[in-house]
């Protein structure tokens, strides 16, 4: 399995050479390419990426609105994400039911509801290929059922919006919304024994740190919260095999 990152920043003004594109990455296996999210400023790249299928975690612009240009590629998303994006010219929509596993190419994909936004709910993807299990969180405050989503996973692609300063707040309804910290996510990985993590979707603070400082900070947090977990920062253009040690 190979991962390629085409965009690694969130919906923030800050950008750098390493992080200028909104969220988009592919999972490639057995000649099949699954595109996970496709943010607004990635428009025009579909012809270059040439995915066989697309997964959308939720309908916020920095995750889904690269599809404003339209596509005939199958787009897998929750019912609410399809409803919110109904005006986008997506011609082949596949609805993901919570915790119901479906085949997408050679992979088995299960959508797990997460907490992120009241009007734009998010689902994480648990993707299985043989013995390898990858979990992509999308934007997240928490999983509704963390053990079901994370137990047995070997690789986690997580929300890098903030390292230690919480961006979680309460909606008028009392529901939590926003982004949890990398530190908190590493705590989950330590609890469930996930061996490797790659963070993407970086916010203002992580982008402004620069890559050497960001790498050091991630490693320090992993040592604290998930000893033995190998952690890395994604960057635009990064390509790596899941077997890579970097």
Residues of each region from the PLM?
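Cap/insert and terminal regions of metallo-dependent hydrolase folds
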Residues: 143-238
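Metal-dependent catalytic neighborhoods of phosphoester/phosphodiester hydrolases
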Residues: 65-73, 87, 207-218
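Metallo-beta-lactamase
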Residues: 2, 77-124, 128-131, 237, ...
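Active-site metal-binding loops of divalent metal-dependent hydrolases
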Residues: 8-10, 38-41, 59, 80, ...
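Short amphipathic alpha-helix with an adjacent loop that forms part of the alpha/beta core around
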Residues: 45-48, 102-106, 147-151
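Conserved beta-strand hairpin/beta-sheet module of binuclear metal-dependent hydrolase folds
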Residues: 1-47, 121-139, 155
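Glycine/Thr-rich phosphate-binding loops of Rossmann-like dinucleotide-binding domains
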Residues: 13, 44, 64-65, 85, ...
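Active-site metal-binding motif and surrounding structural segment of the metallo-beta-lactamase
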Residues: 34, 39-77, 152-156
